[in-house]
């Protein structure tokens, strides 16, 4: 099965120039990609992994999901050749001296488990530093397989794979972006490079669609968490770090793992607006300022609105924040809503926001219907 693809994005083909010294990213090819506003479903922090690959002779498959940009050291060689920060396979060969070239069908593949199943809006196949050893073309397929399947189970004949990115030429040392229009919920991807070569990073942008049965079994859960389907809709300032960090799993591990704004020189304040998993009852709030010591928010408040046209209602009044501290608040009564907003005064940052509660009856019904509609 093949999904329709939007081909209006900038595309790159052909070799990059050999590295000539200096900043290796100086001639890196990239473009503005509209889907990068969505969460990276292949984020290791969400639990993503590269579960198998048919070949990783020169560089390991796990490099595909490293969160930082690929690095390049022109002097770093190992026993198998140049050490590259990505997934790189050996050069394919034909079957005989008369046919030394790989066939049209030859390719290498890697299986990726998404950290959070969801609807994919765009994919970036990044060939940073693979200037003459990138694949001629790539393709990407998606599947929805329940549970924790093994590589053998994913490769079984009865697994239905949907083409998300048809076989498409790519460029070396470039961020090759592809819009995806398949309205389905996927759990796994199969990345193919034709016929061989190297890919530095893979990013899979989309909307998380959580399993409603799992959330129902939990009872009380974080209704704004990224892994449960919460989203950042807007923010006043993203100067130092993305607002999505505030709804990532776990505690912040360092200062830039949270959200920090530039210094304000006016009388305003900074804020983030979120869309909850669906309509929810919020009973408790956590605001964490971990690792924000001289730059944490001075005060914070939380508001909720019920529906797109609803009015904002403050459920946590402006409250003093302490640096590098997790603040917990039990609400006097449950706050019902579909959206939430945190305001910080006057600027600074928070590392995490947690809104603990449960779906309302109609919210749970809508989530279950969407999950079923998307093939979950």
UniProtKB/Swiss-Prot annotation:
GO terms for biological process: allantoin catabolic process; purine nucleobase metabolic process. Its EC number is 3.5.3.4. The keyword Methyltransferase does not apply. InterPro entries: Allantoicase (IPR005164), Allantoicase_dom (IPR015908), Galactose-bd-like_sf (IPR008979). Keywords: Hydrolase, Purine metabolism. Disulfide bonds: none annotated. It holds the Pfam family Allantoicase. Pathway: Nitrogen metabolism; (S)-allantoin degradation; (S)-ureidoglycolate from allantoate (aminidohydrolase route): step 1/1. GO terms for molecular function: allantoicase activity. It is an enzyme of class 3 (hydrolase). It catalyses: allantoate + H2O = (S)-ureidoglycolate + urea. NCBIfam families: allantoicase (TIGR02961). Belongs to the allantoicase family. PANTHER family: ALLANTOICASE, INACTIVE ALLANTOICASE-RELATED. HAMAP family: Allantoicase. This is Probable allantoicase. It comes from Streptomyces coelicolor (strain ATCC BAA-471 / A3(2) / M145).
């Amino acid at each position: 099965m093949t999904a329709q693809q939007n081909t209006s994005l900038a595309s790159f083909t052909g070799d990059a120039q050999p590295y000539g010294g200096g900043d290796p990213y100086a001639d890196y090819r990239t473009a503005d990609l509209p889907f990068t506003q969505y969460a990276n479903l292949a984020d290791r922090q969400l639990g993503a992994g590269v579960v198998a690959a048919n070949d990783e002779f020169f560089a390991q498959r796990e490099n595909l999901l490293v969160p930082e940009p690929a690095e390049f050291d022109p002097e770093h060689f190992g026993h198998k050749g140049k050490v590259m920060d990505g997934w790189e396979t050996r050069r394919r060969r034909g079957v005989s001296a008369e046919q030394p070239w790989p066939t049209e069908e030859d390719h290498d593949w890697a299986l990726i488990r998404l950290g959070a199943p969801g609807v994919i809006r765009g994919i970036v196949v990044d060939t940073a530093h693979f200037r003459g050893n990138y694949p001629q073309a790539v393709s990407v397929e998606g599947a929805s397989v329940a549970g924790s399947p093994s590589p053998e189970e994913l490769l079984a004949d009865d697994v239905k794979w949907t083409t998300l990115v048809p076989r498409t030429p790519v460029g070396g040392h470039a961020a090759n972006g592809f819009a995806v229009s398949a309205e389905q919920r996927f759990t796994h991807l199969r990345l193919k490079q034709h016929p061989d070569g190297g890919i530095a990073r893979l990013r899979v942008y989309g909307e998380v669609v959580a399993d409603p049965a799992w959330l129902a079994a939990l009872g009380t859960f974080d209704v704004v968490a990224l892994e449960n389907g919460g989203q950042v809709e807007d923010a006043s300032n993203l100067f130092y770090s993305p607002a999505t960090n505030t709804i990532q799993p776990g505690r912040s591990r360092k200062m830039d793992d949270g959200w920090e704004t530039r210094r304000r020189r006016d009388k305003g304040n900074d804020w983030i607006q979120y869309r909850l998993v669906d309509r929810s009852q919020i009973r408790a709030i956590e605001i964490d300022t971990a690792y924000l010591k001289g730059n944490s928010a001075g005060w914070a408040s939380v508001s909720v609105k019920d529906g797109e046209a609803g009015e904002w209602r403050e459920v946590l009044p402006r409250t003093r924040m302490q640096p590098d501290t997790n603040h917990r608040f039990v609400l006097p009564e449950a706050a019902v809503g579909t959206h939430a907003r945190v305001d910080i005064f006057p600027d600074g940052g928070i590392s995490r926001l947690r809104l603990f509660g449960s779906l309302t009856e109609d919210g749970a019904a809508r989530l279950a219907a969407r999950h079923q509609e998307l093939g979950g």
